[in-house]
A protein has these predicted regions:
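Acidic, Mg2+-coordinating phosphoryl-transfer loop and its flanking beta/alpha structural elements
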Residues: 167-207
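Glycine-rich phosphate-binding loop signature in dinucleotide/nucleotide-binding domains
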Residues: 3-6, 102-105, 159-165, 223-224
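Substrate-recognition/cap helix-loop segment adjacent to the acidic, metal-dependent catalytic center
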Residues: 35-37, 58-65, 86, 94, ...
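A structural signal for the hydrophobic beta-strands that form the central parallel beta-sheet
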Residues: 109, 136, 168-170, 209
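Conserved Lys-Pro-Asp/Glu-containing loop-to-beta segment of HAD-superfamily phosphomonoesterases
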Residues: 10, 146-176
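Short acidic capping loops at alpha-helix termini that bridge into adjacent secondary structure
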Residues: 42-46, 129-133, 163-167
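N-terminal helical cap/lid subdomain that shapes the substrate entry/recognition surface
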Residues: 4-95, 103, 116
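Short acidic-hydrophobic, aromatic-tinged amphipathic segments that line or gate anion-handling sites
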Residues: 207-215
Length: 227
């Protein structure tokens, strides 16, 4: 879906694979709990391909549905101990966030990552001053996950927005579906879990697929290129 950028008041960003790379810590946490449960961890690349839906969905694929609940319990307990390991901000992220805010456009995180971990990571990476709101999961009043329509409606309502006044930038088909379920414009960066070909397949076009945030900011928003 193309966007009328003159109407955009807020840009929502996915977190993992879009703003930050936290995959090494996620893998370490998974591998640690898998070994605790007597399992042989699958490879880093296998894990990376499963991230995006929810931790329950990810662990169901990695350790099986029968063990997923126990795995989630262990993962949630262990992740705060390792979540800052090897985490970094992806290229162009600070640049695009600053440019959006200078243009008067609000920025928000819209993620399936748990809310507390999302806030802690944004604080640790010093991105919080560039973010107006954070929407994460595992909160009492927010039981949904992308791409459930209710979650997309929830973030729009909290930001007092209609879908045409917002845009979602992500890195996976979950993000595309989450935006489309409410008619929100969506763009993707190929810096996370899916290659450009997979993103083009799920969107049906390469028009809104970009290699990184620098390319997206320049080509879509016409920001001055980073030197």
């Amino acid at each position: 879906m193309s966007a009328d950028l003159s109407k955009i008041q807020t840009v929502f960003f996915d977190l993992d694979g879009t703003l930050i790379d936290n995959f090494r810590a996620i893998y370490k946490c998974y591998a640690d709990i898998a070994r605790e449960m007597g399992l042989v961890p699958k490879s880093y690349h296998v894990l990376r391909a499963t991230v995006g839906g929810s931790i329950t969905m990810t662990l169901s694929k990695l350790i099986g549905e029968d063990l997923a609940d126990e795995g989630v319990r262990r993962f949630r307990a262990h992740f705060p101990e390792v979540m800052f390991e090897d985490v970094f901000v992806l290229e162009g992220v600070e640049w695009i966030l600053k440019n959006l805010r200078e243009r008067g456009i609000r920025t928000a995180v819209f993620t399936n990552k748990e809310h507390a971990s999302s806030v802690a990571l944004l604080d640790y990476l010093k991105l919080s001053p560039l973010i107006d709101a954070v929407f994460g999961t595992n909160l009492p009043d927010m039981p949904w996950r992308k791409p459930q329509r209710e979650y997309s409606e929830y973030v729009l309502e909290k930001m007092n927005l209609s879908a045409e006044n917002a845009m979602l930038i992500g890195d996976s088909p979950f993000d595309v579906s989450a935006a489309r379920t409410v008619g929100m414009p969506v763009a993707c960066v190929a810096t996370g879990t899916h290659l450009p070909e997979a993103l083009i397949e799920c969107t049906g076009s390469q028009e809104m697929i970009f290699p990184n945030m620098f390319a997206l900011g320049h080509d879509l928003f016409k920001f001055i290129p980073h030197n």
